[in-house]
Amino acid sequence: MDDDQRRIPKFYDLSVEERVRAVHERGIVTLDDFRSLATGKHTLALEAADKMVENVVGVMGLPLGLGMNLVVNKKRYVIPMAVEEPSVIAALGSGSKLISEHRGVEASSTDPIM
């Protein structure tokens, strides 16, 4: 599936269930991820959290949203973001739309120097 076929117009207007289905149908998430997201139960178990970081005392949930259609080096990306501020993902979406209308951005890096 090429980048244009992976686009999901008006993604923000879809219900949560429709968004999960749409990203799976376009190959953005795996079948296992789709099944996990479709359950609506995403709480990290305390036992798992304790193995991930030191001094665990609890788990805090944040909404997981997707920044859609960021074009970098002529490839379209979907950016997962766990944030509590609604305008962050909306701003990424607006910026991505403007950028993609002008062929996206190009990124490069230098060889490591250390």
What residue spans do the PLM features occupy?
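Flexible hinge/switch segments at interdomain interfaces of large molecular machines
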Residues: 111-114
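Mobile "lid/hinge" segments at catalytic clefts and subdomain interfaces of large enzymes
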Residues: 84, 88-108
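Acidic/polar, glycine-rich intrinsically disordered N-terminal extensions of enzymes
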Residues: 1-77, 81, 85
